[in-house]
Amino acid sequence: MIRSLDEIIAKGPFLGEQVKGRVNAGLGMAAEPDMEFYKRVVNLYDNMTFDLSQDSNKQVTVVQHVTDLLIECGYDPQFDGIQTICGINIYPPQYFNPQDFKTGVITLTENTYTIHHFAESWKTPIERKLHNMEVVMNRKYGSKGAKLAYIIGLPYWVYKKMKTTGIKGVVVTARKKNNGKQIKM
């Protein structure tokens, strides 16, 4: 935490964008009792089933769920600035997430209150190491470094995909990433 959230809290319920257009409740949030929006979020999760053996590409994060629900309420993912949606102030990334996930670079502004450090506790140790390698290479060599890190980590991701979905899952995922076009092997 860079500074007290008292000023933000005094303005009412809030959420923050992880990146422009993607709201992450894990960055921090405030609510008043019985807010309809949060009832919708809880209801969504109450009616879900979780099967971690499923294809991880089918698993949707809380970021996507919350963002989708906010869009239904009028949230504009392209808007630059603070939006008030369903009685909730949605703050841009500079407020609670000034760290670039891909480079690790932190850009503080006069609006920064907290820094989300992306501990990625849900990932395996090797997945965290692969992401850290991507961050370092992206910072040092730009997008070419990030692509190289992706290539270095690719055998692990293919192995993981095969372990959970079999060879068919690997081919289907590769095809999706290739916009449905035939993949030449």
Predicted regions and their residues:
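Glycosyltransferase-associated regions of secretory-pathway enzymes
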Residues: 2-185
